[in-house]
Amino acid sequence: MAVTTHTPEPQEGTVSDAVRGNWVDRYAPPATRPYLRLSRADRPIGTWLLLLPCWWGLALAMVYDGQASWHDLWIFAGCAIGAFLMRGAGCTWNDITDRNIDGSVSRTASRPIPSGQVSVTGALIWLVLQALLAFGILLIFNLAAIALCVLSLLPVCISPFAKRF
């Protein structure tokens, strides 16, 4: 006798590969939830992976300099907000480029674009908004940091295409 397993359909508006009851599902206004899910705000590990090296570098620079200032706190906050926004922009870009693939994979079919929660146009607008906000934050940094951040966009842009080989 064949054993069949049934994977339950995800709840309306949720993403099947995210933890249930996350902060986006519990606290975010309903109209923002698909966009926050598109940015993977319900899964903070990617933001931490961007943010912790930034904070570590800042801490080392402050120790080397021997003093801290209020400006350093703004840089710490700017790194946090920038990491959140750029991680979100990268995930949004990934979902835009993989939209035709995601719809045919059970793990990703419930993501906002293939499930119809967000249109491609809406996702592009969300991507531009996140990038513009992050760029505004980037302007508080020096030219060397700005150049490094701009250079880091290359792997983000090609990543969705590189994983197809």
Where are these regions (language model features)?
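Residue-level detector of alpha-helical transmembrane segments in integral membrane proteins
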Residues: 1-3, 37, 46, 153
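Short, intrinsically disordered terminal tails adjacent to the first/last structured region
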Residues: 1-15
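Hydrophobic, aromatic-rich alpha-helical transmembrane segments
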Residues: 31, 35, 40-47, 68-76, ...
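Intramembrane alpha-helical segments
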Residues: 32, 36-37, 111-165
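Hydrophobic positions within alpha-helical membrane elements
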Residues: 47, 92, 100-103, 107, ...
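Membrane-embedded alpha-helical segments that form the functional core of polytopic membrane enzymes
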Residues: 54-97, 107, 131-139, 145-159
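The first (N-terminal) embedded transmembrane alpha-helix
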Residues: 41-60
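Cytosolic, membrane-interface loops and tails of multi-pass inner-membrane proteins
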Residues: 11-33, 91-118
